[in-house]
A protein has these predicted regions:
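N-terminal Rossmann-like NAD(P) cofactor-binding subdomain of oxidoreductases
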Residues: 1-102
């Protein structure tokens, strides 16, 4: 059974955690991402054209509440206060904090 994870922060470390989770679906299910001031199109761009890992080889897109990766919807939250992120709404069991704030 895959571990349900959420990612808080989507800079370099958050995107690395994203790629690891997406590349191992048997181990991880990415069920949410929190980005302060989220811009969904920019998130997709940053995933697609990574200067370290190269071009993302899957399907990427956006929908009204988040991004799609290989046909799977991942909700994106835009909370500045970590205590207000609704992780329970997506079923996250573990949160990767990639903000550097904690």
């Amino acid at each position: 059974m895959a571990i349900q994870i959420g990612i808080n922060g989507f800079g370099r470390i958050g995107r690395v955690a994203f790629r690891i989770a997406i590349s191992q679906p048997e181990r991880f299910h990415l069920c949410g991402i929190n980005v302060r001031n989220a811009d969904l199109d920019y998130m997709v761009y940053m995933i697609r054209y990574d200067t370290i890992f190269g071009r993302f080889r899957g399907e990427l897109g956006t929908y009204e509440k988040g991004i799609t990766v290989n046909g799977k919807k991942i909700p994106v939250f835009s909370e500045s206060d970590a205590s207000c992120i609704p992780w329970e709404s997506c079923g996250a069991e573990y949160i990767i904090d990639a903000t550097g704030a904690f």
